[in-house]
Amino acid sequence: MPELPEVETIRRTLAPVLIGALVIGALRGEHPEDILLDPWPVFARRVRRHRIVALERRGKYLAARFEDGDRLVIHLGMTGELRLSHPATAPGKHCHLALVLRSLRPLPPSLVDQRQRFLLRYLDIRRFGRIALLDQAGWETFTARLGPEPLDPTLDPRALWSRLRERRTAIKAALLDQALLAGIGNIYADEALFQARLHPARRCQTLSLDEVERLLVALRTVLSAAIENAGTTIRDYRDGQGRAGSFQSRLQVYGKPAGTPCPRCGTGLARIRIAGRSSVFCPRCQPLH
């Protein structure tokens, strides 16, 4: 599933093309009803005649903001992909819908036709992604349910520690809760816990302030490095230009088979399940007690 670094990379690579473009229509694909919160006819009518003035991200959500304050909010699920395409290109498999846009500035002929039209296609093999049109009030209500982001410089470690002390869950499960911190998934939770030397099954209320400060530093370091490397491509993820990320070559523990030597101490890595997700860690570097 694309996490904060992947969605931020998509935002950065799509923004130069999308900002300023006018949505002039929508094309129905294979199964738009599995992706859209609105029925197709309602969505196709509502999305037309909107100009994109900003491309925003909140946690794992991408939002195209229109000039009237409405937003097209996209969650990519497990295998969602946004792909810029020339109108004459075939959609291919697993394309569920496309926006038809007109650019007000010149774009490469490989992307636009003679009328400066191009497509933004949504592809999704597993169809777990979601797309919704929200007005300003709906967007504010929706984002109010999300926690702060680890990269927010105003996030206070003491405030995070206070919130964690109220929880009796494992720290790994807490990190996956978007109401606590927005944008973290399985990849970067495992990587940050390894860097912070914290066992994924440690109970939140047992963490000291120093440990929470260390965890927040690790989260910021890992997420920033992942963004610098255009995200992590395990299988499906591509950025807004169709390119794979490269952070997968820098992963320390995520996805490693049990018994793989720890990159820090050489101890065999262990794998357990927490909150229904696989967690990989070093039993020596990340002791439970």
UniProtKB/Swiss-Prot annotation:
Its cofactor is Zn(2+). One of its GO terms (biological process) is base-excision repair. It comes from the Bacteria. The keyword DNA repair applies. A zinc finger (FPG-type) spans 252-287. InterPro entries: DNA_glyclase/AP_lyase_DNA-bd, DNA_glyclase_Znf_dom_DNA_BS, Formamido-pyr_DNA_Glyclase, FPG_cat, MutM-like_N-ter, Ribosomal_uS13-like_H2TH, Znf_DNA_glyclase/AP_lyase, Znf_FPG/IleRS. It catalyses: Hydrolysis of DNA containing ring-opened 7-methylguanine residues, releasing 2,6-diamino-4-hydroxy-5-(N-methyl)formamidopyrimidine; 2'-deoxyribonucleotide-(2'-deoxyribose 5'-phosphate)-2'-deoxyribonucleotide-DNA = a 3'-end 2'-deoxyribonucleotide-(2,3-dehydro-2,3-deoxyribose 5'-phosphate)-DNA + a 5'-end 5'-phospho-2'-deoxyribonucleoside-DNA + H(+). Keywords: DNA damage, DNA repair, DNA-binding, Glycosidase, Hydrolase, Lyase, Metal-binding, Multifunctional enzyme, Zinc, Zinc-finger. Binds 1 zinc ion per subunit. SMART domains: Fapy_DNA_glyco (SM00898), H2TH (SM01232). SUPFAM superfamilies: Glucocorticoid receptor-like (DNA-binding domain), N-terminal domain of MutM-like DNA repair proteins, S13-like H2TH domain. The keyword NADP does not apply. Involved in base excision repair of DNA damaged by oxidation or by mutagenic agents. Acts as a DNA glycosylase that recognizes and removes damaged bases. Has a preference for oxidized purines, such as 7,8-dihydro-8-oxoguanine (8-oxoG). Has AP (apurinic/apyrimidinic) lyase activity and introduces nicks in the DNA strand. Cleaves the DNA backbone by beta-delta elimination to generate a single-strand break at the site of the removed base with both 3'- and 5'-phosphates. Belongs to the FPG family. PANTHER family: FORMAMIDOPYRIMIDINE-DNA GLYCOSYLASE. This is Formamidopyrimidine-DNA glycosylase.
